[in-house]
Structures are given as C-alpha cells and as structure tokens.
Amino acid sequence: MKANVILCLLAPLVAALPTETIHLDPELAALRANLTERTADLWDRQASQSIDQLIKRKGKLYFGTATDRGLLQREKNAAIIQADLGQVTPENSMKWQSLENNQGQLNWGDADYLVNFAQQNGKSIRGHTLIWHSQLPAWVNNINNADTLRQVIRTHVSTVVGRYKGKIRAWDVVNEIFNEDGTLRSSVFSRLLGEEFVSIAFRAARDADPSARLYINDYNLDRANYGKVNGLKTYVSKWISQGVPIDGIGSQSHLSGGGGSGTLGALQQLATVPVTELAITELDIQGAPTTDYTQVVQACLSVSKCVGITVWGISDKDSWRASTNPLLFDANFNPKPAYNSIVGILQ
C-alpha cells in the first residue's frame, strides 16, 4: 500500500486520538503513541471501514467488545478497538469483588482506566455488573440480615453508578439471576430478600444516573420457548408493571457451534417484553463458525429493539474459552473468516 494512501486512511483515526494538550493518564499517553505508530499495519489486516461504522449504517448503535486495563495495555487490543469497534464492556474491573473485596476499601484504578480510555477515544461503555452472585466479596455473601443487605445494595449501586454518572450508556444492573427453568436463582440476595433485591438495585441505579439504560443480563437466552426465556419474560413484565425501571434485556450469547440459529426466535420473544432495548452482550461461539456469527448479527439487524452487539473479547488467546477459539481474531490478532463474513453482511 502506498504511503499517501495509508495516510489518507489513517487521517480520521489519528484525528480522533487525544491531542497532546489533553492531560492523559501517563499509561494512556504512552499507549496513544504506540497506536499512532502501529495503525498502518492494522489497516492492512482489517476492513477499510470499522464494523462499528458499518452496523451504525444499519441503524444500530454499536459493535463492541469486552476488555480491561491489562488487555488495553497490550497494544494490538487497543488498536483494534480504536480502528474497528465503538463500545467497550469491562470484563472484570467493575464487578463487586474487583471494586470492594474488603468492605469500605474501594479500588477504582482499573475501572477508571477503562472509562478514561473509552472517553478519550469516543467509545460507548456498558457497565458490567452491579449485582451478581459470582465474583462477590465474602463479606457480602456472609450477610444474614435483610435490612443490612438492603442498605448494602443501595450503597454499592449508588456509589458505583454515581461515580460514572453521564459516562456509561448502559448498566447490567442484575446478572444471571435465573435458573434454567426460569425460576429465581438461589443467592444471598434472593434468600434474604426474595424478588425485592431486583427492585432495590434498579431503583438505586435510576436515582444515581437517570440517563443510563438499565439492563437485566443473562445467558442461555438463545432459544424461543426455553424455560429461562419464558421465566425471564414473565418476571420482567411483572416487575415493569410494578414500576421497576428496567430498560433492557441483555442476551449474553455464549454459544456452541450451531447455536446461532435460535437467536432470531429468542430475540423476537424477548422483544414482546415491555422494555425499550435488547442487546447481544457477551457474544462468543465455540469454533467461531461463520454461519453462526452471521446468524446472530442478522438476528440483531432483524429485531428493531436490538441496539447492538458486544463480542466477549478480541483475540482467541485472551478468551475465557480460549481452548475453543470462539472469537473474531486469532491468537496473532488476525481477523478470522467469521470476522470477514460479518463485514460482508454489514456492507
């Protein structure tokens, strides 16, 4: 590729990077310098337009990925996000255990880093996650008094959401609260408070940031008429009728090969719930079959409430399912056939 062509292609990206007059975090400033030097190589390996830009032309809000500080400091991850994606979800840094493993001792460093990176690079953020039975500090799990737990939930949600008020587009307020048959999962939250913990968390989040979209997020929402899908629909419809401010449903979409075919029917069923949004929130597919990836993307395109897609990581080597090679880039950060097939259907 000739130098002048490269410069023309790079101009919008480099222009979007923060200028030297902005007071950057030192690590981000160093990262920016590395990105500027490496962008030409990435353009040789990616689409001439970002997947994010392409999906926005189809009426959706974003195509994003999960990441965190450690991954962003590996320059290929950051550069790919810069060039091709429009949204980031913190993989771990906003989970309760990461933020407050010891009561009252808050660790904002990694979460702040991700938020700063996103803001300095014009990326939307999905906050993940406020209430989850896993990666939960022992001191929360050991609470045995309902009134204490109510206050702890309110304090946690209002503190975290309030810190990032106006900076985070959407929050996964509650995560994985259903069993496969659609009943409520047993956790410290449901054991002490029953369904009430859902209302407490959503109301606290709404009060802390009225502009943020508030989601309930879960896995195995990938087949129409599945028990969890039906149970979630019933519960969420009831909670909304009771005034609980639930704006959206997130379908994680951690799929096995062949699982993409059920996504459209499942999204169509979820769209009957009186929420304003749906989203594919944690997409990865065992073996990364092109057919399954394109089926999921086409499903989101076909359902008006589906606002966007987040893939759960960039490179296979960094995936929580690394042995199954489920992502769009291989271990060397080269785009895989599934990546190219998505670009093809979005063009």
Swiss-Prot record:
Chief location of this protein within or outside the cell: secreted
Modified residues annotated as Pyrrolidone carboxylic acid in this record: 46
Enzyme Commission number, as recorded: 3.2.1.8
Domain of life: Eukaryota
GO molecular function: endo-1,4-beta-xylanase activity
Protein name, per record: Endo-1,4-beta-xylanase 3
Pathway it works in: Glycan degradation; xylan degradation
Role, per record: Glycoside hydrolase involved in the hydrolysis of xylan, a major plant cell wall hemicellulose made up of 1,4-beta-linked D-xylopyranose residues. Catalyzes the endohydrolysis of the main-chain 1,4-beta-glycosidic bonds connecting the xylose subunits yielding various xylooligosaccharides and xylose. Produces xylobiose and xylotriose as the main degradation products.
Catalytic residues of the enzyme: 176 (proton donor), 282 (nucleophile)
Record InterPro entries: GH10, GH10_dom, Glycoside_hydrolase_SF
GO cellular component: extracellular region
Pfam families: Glyco_hydro_10 (PF00331)
Assembly, per entry: Monomer.
Listed GO biological process terms: xylan catabolic process
Annotated ranges, domain GH10: 46-345
Lineage, top ranks: Eukaryota, Fungi, Dikarya, Ascomycota, Pezizomycotina
Signal sequence segment: 1-16
Catalytic activity: Endohydrolysis of (1->4)-beta-D-xylosidic linkages in xylans
Propeptide, residue positions: 17-45
Cell compartments where the protein resides: Secreted
Disulfide cross-links: 300-306
Family to which the UniProt record says this protein belongs: Belongs to the glycosyl hydrolase 10 (cellulase F) family.
PTM comment text: Not glycosylated.
Assigned keywords, A-Z: Carbohydrate metabolism, Disulfide bond, Glycosidase, Hydrolase, Polysaccharide degradation, Pyrrolidone carboxylic acid, Secreted, Signal, Xylan degradation
